[in-house]
Amino acid sequence: MKRILALVLAALTAVVLLASCGGSAKYIVLEDNFGAEEYAIGFRKDDYALAAKVQEILDEMSSDGTAGKISETWFGNKDAFLTGKEFPRAMQTVDGDNSLQYVLDKGTLVLGLDESFPPMGYRDSKTGEVVGFDIDLAKEVATRLGVELVIQPINWDAKELELNGKNIDLIWNGMSITDERTANMFLSKPYVANAQIIIVPEGSAIKTRADLAGKKVALQRGSSALEAVQADEETYNAILNGGEIVEFDDNITAYLDLKSGRVDAFVVDKVVGEWIIKNN
């Protein structure tokens, strides 16, 4: 998997270098989008003790300025880390909840992520290490918890299976809060604001969601981008009327297809999409 992603990232770099010779196409974010949302960390549905402790540490990091420094490193803005938010679902105390002790006893906190989701968590093509905003936050949480952080790349479409099967302890990777996820997991307080945006080549005839009718639209399989498009029934049905929703395992590959002209538009998290445009 690591080798495949490395090849994909290398291919993306090659595309960008080729495009820079003789005038490269530019890509823009449309003002119209599929709505605002927020990111949260996902825990197993009844792992309240672990969730409470991780949130307590994050609140401490917010108060002592650590979260702000990490935010400034990745976003150039200390205020990108949200404060004053509430849990999407009420915190509870459950008899027999040993979720925190389970992590402390094994000495590791296993973080599940899609390793191609910059700048939240992604594999650096130069060092081979997984880095990102979420990774830096999680490293500090693990240090204060007194355990080792283990980063476990997963198939994003199977994230809940990985979580409930105890292959990972939490999902921490720019995961958008949705009603379905709130019902199936226990979510932390929101910590980053986001939106589902539309990216197109500069000069494209696509100016709004309505213009996606009959077009090929790229997005990540199992993502909140897909959920957002499907939730907008009018736009979704218009796309399928002569067009196609093209699903990819990761956002980098989806972006490659946009650059190659195989799709007409790319729907993706604002945080990720803006990073891709800025860095490529």
Model-based region annotation:
Residues 50-53, 60-74, 93-174, 247:
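Extracytoplasmic small-molecule ligand-binding "clamshell" domains
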Residues 19-35, 158-161, 174-183, 228-231, ...:
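A ligand-binding cleft/hinge motif common to bilobed small-molecule-binding domains
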Residues 37-56, 196-208:
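A bilobed periplasmic-binding-protein/Venus flytrap-type ligand-binding module shared by bacterial periplasmic
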Residues 108-113, 210-227:
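Short loop->beta-strand "edge-of-pocket" segments that line small-molecule binding or catalytic clefts
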Residues 2-22:
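Sec-dependent N-terminal signal peptides of Gram-positive bacterial secreted proteins and lipoproteins
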Residues 33-35, 56-98, 224-245, 278-280:
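Ligand-binding clefts/hinges and TM-proximal coupling segments of bilobed small-molecule sensing domains
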Residues 26-33, 135, 139, 143, ...:
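Acidic, polar ligand-binding/catalytic clefts
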Residues 41, 54, 141, 163-164, ...:
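Hydrophobic residues within well-ordered alpha-helices
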